[in-house]
Curated annotation (Swiss-Prot):
Organism (species): Arabidopsis thaliana
GO biological process, one term: DNA repair
Reaction catalysed by this enzyme: an N(6)-methyl-2'-deoxyadenosine in DNA + 2-oxoglutarate + O2 = a 2'-deoxyadenosine in DNA + formaldehyde + succinate + CO2
Protein name, UniProt field: Probable DNA N(6)-methyladenine demethylase ALKBH1B
Taxonomic placement: Eukaryota, Viridiplantae, Streptophyta, Embryophyta, Tracheophyta
Group of enzyme by EC: oxidoreductase
Positions with a binding annotation for 2-oxoglutarate: N357, F358, Y359, R461, L462, F463, F464, R465
GO MF terms, alphabetically ordered: DNA N6-methyladenine demethylase activity; metal ion binding
Tissues of expression: Undetectable.
Family in the record: Belongs to the alkB family.
Top-level taxon: Eukaryota
Disulfide bonds, paired cysteine numbers: none
Function per UniProt: Dioxygenase that may catalyzes DNA N(6)-methyladenine (6 mA) demethylation. Requires molecular oxygen, alpha-ketoglutarate and iron.
Length: 473
């Protein structure tokens, strides 16, 4: 199709495409198009777009009389609307509301009423183009454009085209960026409220605002997961003082932990993104329970210096699960050890500090040891595309006793690193899945540990189903 001076004329809900170099300069052309479009008996349909070839020099009147002559094939314009049905998705309510607000801002006075009337009467109609005349023709055909809008309101049910945004705008595309992700940590942390950005940011919800397209689980898959849950957990002694309890947490307990973490995370002292004095931010969201851990001073305290909030209390259910898991690990160590006092490898612990870390799909945590200022450690691992991790350490006296760190994994699988040296290449790897509990104390108390990556492996479907119906808001 050879057109050299092509332009689009937006007339009401019509788009008339014209090669101006191949038309006679007639001031009555636009009026003729309008009359033809509004004439029910006209051969020119409201949804037609005509492209005139450059070498075809004829008037508009000649075009419509030529269709009845034998030379129709030589003068008939090319129609870019091919004879096939277009299949598309219906716009969402959110998209329609956003476009209504955009369009409303562009109109004023009577035009705004016309627009609202048009949009409200076209629930089942897909529109194409904007309800305005293009800038190029706005001054010349403003009356004609207004007339077309009024007439098309009453004839909207006869028009079936595809809706798209008339005016592109980037103003609405940046409002969904998380203020938590972009905030900067104040260089000092010696008092509350040092970061105005953090204190004013909205609470972070670990239920991420995105839809995950998943197929409905088959009965075979559901039965397999039920059998796995009924089978119970299995214990593995990784190294002296380190025990992995596979599939230890029941689905109900996993749902309970996630819902309580979400509920606490949306309140005072909830999830935030910690950082350092140089402005660097950790690749996770953190919430402290019992006491606050300051990553800059590496000390625990009664308040969070960044905003002065008081950490929530540790739920009783969490402490009960920790105590029960440690007893199971002691029993496992005693069974697998040749030593008569093998069960003393992992001391009993009643946690008083819980650091909950939430990782998204790109989250990670470098190799580190629990500081000598830590009080206790308790790890949750990720949920639904995120990753939760908590550390509970103790003072020097507690470190000498080898009080353990307890890590609960919930959600997607995580690649967990551990080793005696702070060297990623020499570190060993464990894949922690939803429901796993990892405990390391005594001789493994000072082991370096971290999270390399979050794997795109979703937790059991039963977990999702129970979470949907039992979530605490």
């Amino acid at each position: 199709m050879a057109t050299t001076n092509y332009s689009m004329i937006f007339i009401g809900n019509l788009q008339v495409a014209v090669d101006r170099s191949s038309l006679y300069e007639s001031s009555d052309y636009s009026s003729f198009v309008a009359r033809e479009c509004l004439n029910k008996d006209s051969a020119m349909k409201p949804y037609d777009i005509f492209i005139f070839e450059k070498d075809e020099h004829f008037s508009v009147e000649d075009h419509y009389t030529a269709g009845n002559s034998s030379n129709e094939s030589n003068t008939r314009p090319s129609d870019i609307f091919l004879k096939k049905k277009l299949v598309g998705l219906n716009p969402s309510i959110l998209q329609l509301n956003r476009e209504k607000r955009k369009a409303t801002l562009k109109f004023s006075g009577d035009n705004k009423d016309i627009l609202q009337s048009t949009l409200s009467s076209s629930k089942n109609i897909n529109l194409s183009g904007g309800l305005f005349v293009s800038r190029e023709y706005e001054n010349k055909y403003v009356k004609f454009g207004a007339r077309m809008r009024c007439d098309l309101v009453n004839r909207m049910k006869d028009v079936t085209l595809a809706w798209h945004e008339s005016v592109s705008s980037t103003s609405d595309k940046n409002v969904e960026l998380s203020s938590v992700e972009n905030h900067k940590i104040a260089p000092k942390a010696d008092g509350p409220g040092n970061s105005s950005n953090e204190s004013s940011s909205s609470p972070f919800d670990i239920f991420l605002k995105k839809k995950v397209m998943r197929l409905k689980p088959s009965f075979l898959e559901l039965n397999r997961e039920k059998k796995k849950a009924a089978k119970g957990f299995s214990g593995i002694v990784i190294r002296p003082g380190m025990v992995l309890l596979k599939n230890y947490l029941s689905i109900n307990n996993q749902v309970m932990i996630v819902n309580k973490c979400r509920q606490l995370g949306l309140g005072e002292g909830g999830f935030y993104q910690p950082g350092f004095q140089d402005g660097g931010l950790l690749h996770l969201k953190m919430m402290c329970l019992g006491k606050n851990w300051d990553c800059q001073t590496r000390r625990y305290g009664e308040i969070r210096p960044i905003d002065g909030s008081v950490p929530p209390r540790i739920p009783v259910e969490f402490s009960q699960l920790v105590e029960k898991a440690i007893k199971e690990s002691k029993s496992l160590v005693a069974t697998n050890s040749n030593e008569t006092k093998g069960g003393d490898e992992i001391p009993l612990l009643l946690p008083d500090i819980c650091v909950v870390n939430f990782y998204t799909s790109t989250g990670k945590l470098g190799l580190h040891q629990v500081s000598v200022y830590d009080k206790t450690s308790f790890d949750f691992l990720k949920y639904k595309g995120g990753y939760l991790n908590t550390d509970k350490g103790e003072s020097k006296k507690s470190l000498r006793k080898g009080l353990p760190i307890v890590s609960f994994s919930i959600g997607d699988s995580a690649e967990f690193l551990y080793g005696d040296q702070k060297d990623v290449d020499k570190a060993d790897t464990l894949i922690l899945e939803s429901g796993d509990v990892l405990i390391f104390g005594e001789r493994s108390r000072n082991v370096f540990h971290g999270v390399r990556s979050i794997r795109k492996i979703l937790p059991p479907r039963l977990f999702f189903r129970k979470q949907i119906f039992n979530q605490v808001v």
